[in-house]
């Protein structure tokens, strides 16, 4: 679930989050308790950032972006208007979002920003590119350097340019090996999953 308002950052002397002295936080915005914002990052106005997020160095978060709780944003990431991330999302170093399908310097297309939604628990690897207008499913895993040009289903593992699906992963990020009955077990959590009609679902908590 996306966060509700948890701490307006208009009164810096009452912040319930950490902001490095070189970081810039524009007003108004909402930043959750326990979030950390590191060197040279810029949080623009009207953003919503949940609790216990970690915003790395040299990160830009554009107006009206929404991040859930416990989102990890690594160094050198720009998150543009139109992007929303649910809880527990991981954005790897220097990964890229876009928000206009056909940008031109001489043509203002600010009213044509395409939306991108990243589902709960998904991971996007270093230097990956997410072309706007395509959603990333829950717990999906986008490999380093991948270029995503279509919507990615829950639990999918994708790599390459353009990104192609190699298989499936569980909530802990391990690749799932399905037996003849379509059942797989995570080697770490022992969670069971079922593959049916090209969709993966949890079948046992």
Task: Describe these PLM feature segments.
Residues 15-21, 27-29, 36-135, 167:
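Flexible, glycine/small-residue-enriched loop-and-beta-strand segment within the central core
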Residues 165-168, 184:
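Cys/His-enriched microdomains
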Residues 154-160, 169-178:
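Short, intrinsically disordered, charge-biased short linear motifs at domain edges
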Residues 54, 123, 141, 157-159:
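Short-chain dehydrogenase/reductase
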Residues 178-179, 194-196:
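Short, non-ligating residues that shape and space the ligands of small metal-coordination modules
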Residues 170, 186-189:
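Short cysteine-rich clusters marking metal-coordination/redox-active sites
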